[in-house]
């Protein structure tokens, strides 16, 4: 008889939303034992948000089925019969990430908030993206004077803490973000300058960034194409690959998940692929909604994008979003009821994205009011106290979607645990092994038999 179990933490989200802050002890990258409940079928629906409209129960059940099918695999442990087995999740495979502000790694590195910023990041996120440090206009404000220091500092810190980092961005052709000194260059000099930037960045950081946004928001404006012709995007990619042949290049654009520019983006991506541009993934920003978001538009957009056959990252997520009153007036704060609505909406947004197998990660565009372009969208207030959204997020990621199982192997010395894809510590009878349960493999076996 096989010991088959689905381990789900015995914690309900709505205790948190009602004011219970017990989730501060939720596990992070290294965790202790947490008593699980054992369900014969997926039971995520009872533990997460309720803001989705329509036939709620059916919608939640469908999302849960998709999550169980696409985000979980089987971890088999082989021991002597009847031995105690513990399976502890250490890290998710899926990217639950955030943007890293330049300040704590540059001019604010000695600030009293810097240590707290890094600590809270590591407690909540397993992936990162440079918010501004890699942007050309930030690195080279004056021609020929390139400042690599902040990028270097961020890369050193993320590498030390085993945080995969995406590079945002190599180019940004929206005119207001093109370095002013470039606009007086003649076309030939501009082309040589673009080539130099691509090769230099890729060569200097070869193998250190997991992926790059090649040319940010091309669909909305493309100064370099306007100046240098439609073939420049392919050339940019080729030059980056000259510096780092393994570089993974993403598109990154906005107003797609709202549905407003979805068709345009699909056409844009297909056109670049037809030109031979080596697109490695689709970056879609997640902050063009307002005080609410349309779950049906989000689901439809993700399903449509999945049809392109490329991995998807939700690269810049804020809630409330850029079309909210909180973006227009940065001093506005959420009231109690609005805080709870925000928490529920974030849970729903993440659940929809997590249920779509083509989505490989979500990265918040700021998590602390002290370094967030939409302060009201932060998980943590200026004084570092957690918002209801922080409690809800941690409960979702580190309890509802977290596998921590303890039991005994059967009379054949076998135990199968359905577990979320990620890294695990498996322990039995004083022996321990760390293994990766990957979505590519779908299953892994760990043997402690002599």
Where do the language-model regions lie?
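Aromatic-rich peripheral "rim/lid" segments of glycoside hydrolase catalytic domains that contact
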Residues: 204, 213, 218-226, 233-235, ...
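Acidic (Asp/Glu)-rich catalytic clusters
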Residues: 116-125, 152-164, 202-206, 240-243, ...
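Substrate-binding cleft and catalytic face of glycoside hydrolase catalytic domains
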Residues: 127-141, 150-256
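Noncatalytic carbohydrate-binding groove/subsite architecture in carbohydrate-active enzymes
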Residues: 101-115, 225-327
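Bacterial N-terminal signal peptides that target proteins for export
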Residues: 33-43
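Bacterial N-terminal signal peptides
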Residues: 42-51
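Beta-strand-rich domain onsets/edges
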Residues: 56-107, 136-139, 184, 228-231, ...
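Hydrophobic faces of well-ordered beta-strands that scaffold small-molecule active sites
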Residues: 96-98, 126-130, 165-168, 210, ...
